[in-house]
Design a protein with these regions (language model features):
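Long, acidic, intrinsically disordered low-complexity segments
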Residues: 1-18
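Non-catalytic protein-protein interaction segments used by genome-maintenance enzymes to assemble
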Residues: 138, 143-206, 212
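Nuclease catalytic cores
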Residues: 23-24, 28-67, 121, 145, ...
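Extracellular structured ligand-interaction cores
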Residues: 52, 165-167, 216
Length: 310
């Protein structure tokens, strides 16, 4: 259960509520943070292949049912995944974009939905007959999508009122001396580009959520490989690679939390957070490329070049 976690309970987000994604964006590029959170430039709603969202929805419904002792057919969860897909698509006037930013036609959309269901089925099948994900038992998840918040303890140096806040995907147990949390990811099926314990060790999210728990934390990432069931020309494969979920794990301790607080302190100071960003001086952290202003994954390249490009 989420014992020991302070719940936000729908509380309004404030400037001094810092999520892992907010801190991570600033860490990668303060200019991107500035456009997003200070200038509040909103891009037109686009849905880029919401397969991951659909899979998450199916799995979340499954885990919530398991914790309540409810059993349903696989088709029910496939339907929940499709409903989540439809909700995402409604936000962009029914248009879904592929990985290259091109609008998808109805056949491509139907194929993408089928692929998302195939990935979910891999997770569902792995749990049958008492199965686990490399020793991690999703049946142990007690709560999903927990909106947690904690005021930052700056230590003897002190600091301004600041909170860490985030939606913890899966809470397993927070009552013992070591909290147990987890998160579901979909990933490249090539393990070279997928996940490992080393990649899990580098995740800011795991540190932030461990800090929310207020104690050492074992954090598991459960990975669903995005195996393709259609060829490049759109033909369904006769024998697609089976989806076999796997596990990447890491532990967070006081050492990690100390470094996390140091990063937070730098963030608060650099952004002038508690003075409504008045003295924030952002700069672009460009990734060099021969084909444009910057090769980072970012929604603000046009604005960035116009503002910082001279």
């Amino acid at each position: 259960m989420a014992e020991g976690l302070q719940l936000a309970n729908g509380r309004r987000w404030e400037n001094n509520h810092i999520s892992p994604s907010k801190l991570d964006l600033w860490s990668k590029c303060s200019a991107a943070f500035w456009f997003r959170y200070v200038m509040r430039i909103r891009k037109p709603g686009k849905v880029w292949l919401p397969q991951g969202t659909a899979v998450h929805a199916g799995v979340e419904h499954l885990l919530n049912d398991l914790s309540a002792g409810i059993q349903r057919d696989k088709e029910y969860y496939e339907l929940m995944a499709e409903v989540a897909w439809d909700e995402q698509v409604e936000r962009s006037n029914g248009i879904v974009y592929d990985k290259k930013g091109n609008p998808m036609n109805s056949i491509q959309v139907d194929s993408a939905i089928e692929e998302a269901k195939y990935w979910f089925n891999g997770f569902y099948d792995a749990m049958q007959n008492g199965g686990t994900i490399e020793g991690f038992d999703p049946r142990d998840v007690t709560e999903t999508e927990v909106d947690a918040i904690r005021e930052v303890d700056w230590g003897p140096e002190g600091g301004p009122e600041t909170y860490i806040r985030g939606y913890i995907d899966w809470v397993v147990d927070t009552s013992g001396p070591i909290a147990k949390l987890a998160d579901l990811k979909t990933s490249n099926p090539n393990r070279r580009w997928g996940w490992s314990d080393k990649k899990a060790d580098a995740q800011l999210q795991a540190t932030a959520y461990g800090y929310l728990a207020g104690k050492p934390t074992d954090f598991d990432y459960i990975i669903i490989p995005k195996e393709e069931i259609f060829t490049a020309s759109g033909v369904r494969k006769n024998n697609p690679t089976p989806v076999r979920p796997y596990r990447a794990k890491t532990r967070r301790t006081a050492v990690h939390y100390k470094a996390f607080i140091n990063r937070l302190r730098a963030f608060v100071r650099d952004t002038d957070l508690h003075n409504n960003y008045a003295d924030f001086k952002p700069w672009p952290n460009q990734k060099p490329t021969n084909y444009g202003w910057c090769d980072q994954l970012c929604d603000y390249k046009e604005e960035c070049q116009a503002h910082f490009g001279g």
